[in-house]
């Protein structure tokens, strides 16, 4: 009995030991499983960390690449800007070179034109050109050697020369306009734009300097010899030089399209602000301009006293027929006293106003002569001064 009990006790103890062993084994297994799970988790985390690291590296490389690309783009933009600056500088240089070439070419053209004009002046035998003072010849000839040396002149000198030529051209254009326009229209235009008259008289002064003699000087000398004080009307006076030089000797009234100074009264010469028979001497010095210049003669006859003098200076090249011209003046109540044809450029005339009883006969006679003359030729007695285009 005791043995059986002991064996039973041993078995129970063994079973307990087995159970504890199995429990230990189970615990060990569980621990191992947990460790394995933890290892797996750790491995996953490590992998994730590695992936994150690799991603971070990739992001860093991408950022670096992006920065490099931006830097490259910035460099390209800077390069483009520099290229633009360089190209603009090149364009400026090209433009400057072109301007220099244009200046040189214009200088060469100017010299060539001067040479061509000299050749024309030598070969041209046209009388109208010879005596037309509105297109004067150069005061001194330019040789071939001097024309070559003129290429070395400063640009400013050539520009000044070109400017003077342009002024001359402007003057001739205005001069032609005055000759081919009715005086009423000319008075309106010049009144509205004073600069036109200033340009005209600036050019006129330049032209007069090249003339061998100014007809106004001859008229002033003639009037200064008159001892008795006279009332004189300077019709188409310009700057009123006649009044300036003779105001101490005579009473002078000066009229023109524009009053350039205090001595001048602005008006249309065909409608003078003067009373009938209030003037002793009327002067037209190169001022029978306009398509209605005969109206100027009629107005002069109105304001002159009986026996009053009419003095006219006219360019020789304008007069188509000197007898026809004097007849034209005489039929409006004047008688030719004298004429001076000694100067090859100008002709000077002096007429006196007729008495009333003589005028009717003279007008009928001169009208008949005029009709006969017009049948023979249709040319006007005074040609307009036209600018010859070269």
UniProtKB/Swiss-Prot annotation:
Gene Ontology molecular function: methylated histone binding; methyltransferase activity
Main location: nucleus
UniProt-annotated location(s): Nucleus, Nucleolus
Single GO cellular component term: rDNA heterochromatin
Transmembrane portions of the chain: none
Region of interest (Disordered), residue spans: 1-85, 106-160
Biological processes, Gene Ontology terms: methylation; rDNA heterochromatin formation; rRNA processing
Biased composition (Low complexity): 22-71, 140-152
Enzyme type, top EC level: transferase
Binding residue positions for S-adenosyl-L-methionine: 201, 236, 256, 268, 285
SUPFAM superfamilies tied to this protein: S-adenosyl-L-methionine-dependent methyltransferases
UniProt EC number: 2.1.1.-
Any matching Pfam family: Methyltransf_8
Keywords annotated in UniProt: Chromatin regulator, Methyltransferase, Nucleus, Repressor, rRNA processing, S-adenosyl-L-methionine, Transcription, Transcription regulation, Transferase
Top-level taxon of the source organism: Eukaryota
Function recorded in the entry: Probable methyltransferase required to silence rDNA.
Protein name, as recorded: Ribosomal RNA-processing protein 8
Organism expressing this protein natively: Dictyostelium discoideum
Taxonomic placement: Eukaryota, Amoebozoa, Evosea, Eumycetozoa, Dictyostelia
Gene: rrp8
């Amino acid at each position: 009995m005791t043995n059986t009990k002991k064996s039973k006790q041993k078995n129970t103890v063994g079973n307990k030991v087995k159970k504890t062993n199995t429990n230990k084994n189970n615990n060990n297994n569980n621990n191992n499983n947990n460790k394995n799970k933890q290892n797996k988790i750790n491995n996953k985390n490590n992998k994730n960390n590695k992936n994150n690291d690799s991603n971070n590296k990739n992001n860093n490389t991408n950022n670096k690449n992006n920065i490099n690309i931006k830097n490259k783009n910035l460099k390209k933009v800077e390069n483009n800007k520099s290229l633009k600056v360089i190209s603009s500088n090149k364009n400026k240089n090209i433009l400057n070179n072109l301007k220099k070439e244009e200046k040189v070419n214009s200088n060469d053209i100017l010299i060539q034109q001067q040479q061509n004009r000299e050749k024309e002046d030598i070969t041209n035998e046209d009388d109208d050109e010879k005596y037309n003072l509105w297109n004067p010849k150069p005061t001194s000839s330019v040789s071939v050697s001097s024309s070559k040396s003129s290429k070395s002149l400063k640009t400013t000198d050539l520009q000044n020369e070109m400017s003077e030529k342009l002024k001359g051209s402007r003057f001739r254009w205005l001069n032609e306009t005055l000759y081919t326009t009715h005086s009423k229209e000319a008075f309106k235009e010049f009144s509205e734009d004073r600069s036109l008259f200033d340009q005209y008289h600036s050019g006129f002064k330049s032209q007069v300097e090249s003339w061998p003699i100014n007809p106004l000087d001859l008229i002033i000398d003639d009037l200064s010899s008159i001892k008795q004080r006279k009332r004189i009307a300077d019709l188409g006076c310009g700057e009123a030089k006649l009044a300036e030089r003779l105001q101490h000797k005579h009473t002078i009234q000066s009229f023109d399209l524009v009053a350039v100074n205090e001595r001048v009264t602005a008006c249309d010469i065909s409608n003078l602000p003067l009373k009938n028979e209030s003037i002793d001497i009327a002067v037209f010095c190169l001022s029978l301009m306009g398509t209605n210049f005969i109206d100027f003669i009629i107005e002069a006859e109105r304001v002159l006293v009986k026996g009053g003098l009419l003095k006219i200076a006219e360019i020789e090249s304008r007069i188509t027929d000197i007898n026809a011209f004097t007849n034209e003046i005489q039929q409006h109540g004047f008688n030719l006293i004298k004429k001076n044809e000694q100067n090859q450029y100008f002709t000077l005339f002096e007429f006196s106003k007729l008495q009333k009883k003589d005028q009717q006969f003279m007008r009928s006679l001169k009208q008949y002569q005029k009709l006969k003359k017009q049948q023979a030729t249709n040319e006007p007695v005074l040609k307009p001064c036209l600018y010859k285009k070269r």
